[in-house]
Regions:
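Intrinsic structural disorder/low-complexity segments
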Residues: 15-18, 54, 86
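Compositionally biased, intrinsically disordered low-complexity regions
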Residues: 10-13, 63, 77, 83
Length: 87
């Protein structure tokens, strides 16, 4: 259950990052880049609220990928770790 606006932003950030990586998998460059813009905008608002948000990004043949989400020093989602478990 969402308790405050920060929790709402966190959910939206998770959704945007998931979309970034999903559209990279689907090779949809426009949606990949739009969702990256959304993720970084949400992260910036969270920074403005005083939280440290780290969204590392790398280029995968023209598609952006975000390997993990780190908020206030805690790794919330690690896509690389989850990917290696499924291989």
């Amino acid at each position: 259950m969402k308790e405050n606006y920060f929790d709402t932003l966190k959910v939206r950030l998770f959704q945007a990052v998931d979309n970034v990586n999903r559209y990279a998998d689907e090779k949809d460059c426009n949606r990949n880049h739009v969702n990256y813009g959304s993720a970084t905008s949400i992260a910036r608002v969270m920074n403005d609220f005083g939280h440290d948000v780290d969204l590392p990004v790398w280029d995968d043949g023209g598609f952006l990928r975000i390997p993990k989400i780190v908020i206030d020093g805690k790794v919330w989602i690690d896509y690389e770790k989850n990917q290696s478990k499924s291989e």
